[in-house]
Design a protein with these regions (language model features):
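Conserved DEDDh/DEDDy metal-dependent 3′-5′ exonuclease domain
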Residues: 2-4, 8, 13-17, 28-95
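Short consensus segments that form the blades of beta-propeller domains
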Residues: 21-26
Length: 95
């Protein structure tokens, strides 16, 4: 199991516009992503602070193996993944 969490910022008010509109707002940015694959240590990904901003190799491999993702607010994380991580950073699409 992959546990996944995002920290974000935006001029859009999440409580007023909802997760999908928030994730589509051009001012919405990802501050960092934290993830844990199984019992491995928690990893952090910070846009602009990596050799490149593509998906970390261990996370990509875990997804490719069919490992499931859990998140405390999965609709938010999924919206952000689909509308920010994939188009802006080239992360693979998730269902």
């Amino acid at each position: 199991m992959i546990t996944f969490d995002l920290e974000t910022k935006s001029y859009a008010d999440l409580t007023k516009v909802g997760a999908w509109a928030y994730s589509k707002d051009p001012t919405t940015q990802i501050i960092c992503a934290c993830y844990q694959i199984g019992d491995a240590p928690i990893q952090e990904w910070w846009p602009g602070k990596n050799a490149d901003d593509s998906i970390p190799e261990d996370l990509r491999d875990a997804l490719a193996s069919g490992m499931l993702i859990e998140a405390h607010n999965i609709s938010f994380e999924r919206s952000m993944w689909m509308n920010v991580l994939t188009p802006r950073y080239g992360w693979p699409e998730v269902l």
